[in-house]
């Protein structure tokens, strides 16, 4: 009986330790994301694991023949030269 209780206590302690260590990792990750400015690491900071900017997508069902026909439908949020369009059953553009 005592051996079983000791085993259970040991397993419970390991579970608590594993859970607490995973919380520490999550806190470090949040700190890293807070340090990002505009999706980039600020000056002097390295490896801040910035999240990529959200991709803007524009779908248009107007007929097209080539990908080049679709560039006029680039989302307004795209910076010059960052828009990629394709023609599949209508235009789909993203940046």
Curated annotation (Swiss-Prot):
Residues 1-26 form the signal peptide. Disulfide bonds join 48-95, 64-83, 70-91, 74-93. The keyword Signal applies. It is found in: Secreted. GO terms for cellular component: extracellular region. Keywords: Antimicrobial, Disulfide bond, Fungicide, Plant defense, Secreted, Signal. GO terms for biological process: defense response to fungus; killing of cells of another organism. Belongs to the DEFL family. This is Putative defensin-like protein 262.
